[in-house]
Swiss-Prot record:
Pfam families: Ribosomal_L20
Top-level taxon: Eukaryota
Keyword tags: Cyanelle, Plastid, Ribonucleoprotein, Ribosomal protein, RNA-binding, rRNA-binding
GO cellular component, as recorded: cyanelle; ribonucleoprotein complex; ribosome
Family membership noted in the UniProt record: Belongs to the bacterial ribosomal protein bL20 family.
Function: Binds directly to 23S ribosomal RNA and is necessary for the in vitro assembly process of the 50S ribosomal subunit. It is not involved in the protein synthesizing functions of that subunit.
GO molecular-function terms, A-Z: rRNA binding; structural constituent of ribosome
UniProt-listed CDD domains: Ribosomal_L20
Name of the gene this protein is made from: rpl20
Organism the protein comes from: Cyanophora paradoxa
Subcellular location: Plastid, Cyanelle
Gene Ontology terms describing biological process: translation
Name of the featured protein: Large ribosomal subunit protein bL20c
Main location: plastid
InterPro entries: Ribosomal_bL20, RIBOSOMAL_L20_CS, Ribosomal_protein_bL20_C
Length: 114
């Protein structure tokens, strides 16, 4: 069997991992084996947290809408149910923006609900 020389390939692979690990503390940024484990874990966390961020923002929007609606004596679930019945299509993000930055517009929306 012929000899396979892969010094350049191996060096490039290790450099890539160590570059991704720069900024980690201690051996996690210097030793390849430890750095490789930490990079894999960090990438896994990054992937999971990109999806978690979507859940967190939705929860934040719902909390803001609920707080503003309760000031006017209405719960979040009743508000969303009424909007759906009246075919008022506003997503939670824009509703929460209205609730925070444009109270008058939010109150107008609440007035349309019987």
């Amino acid at each position: 069997m012929t000899r396979v020389k892969r010094g350049n390939v191996a060096r490039k692979r290790r450099k890539k991992i160590l570059k991704l690990a720069s900024g980690f503390r201690g051996a996690h940024s210097r030793l390849f084996r430890v750095a490789n484990q930490q990079v894999m874990k960090a990438l896994r966390y990054a992937y999971n947290d990109r999806n978690k961020r979507k859940r967190d923002f939705r929860a934040l929007w719902i909390a803001r809408i609920n707080a503003s609606a309760r000031l006017e004596g209405m719960t979040y679930s009743k508000l969303m149910g009424s909007l759906k019945k009246l075919n008022i299509i506003l997503n939670r993000k824009s509703l929460s923006q209205l609730a925070i930055y444009d109270k008058d517009a939010f109150m107008e929306i609440l007035k349309t609900i019987p």
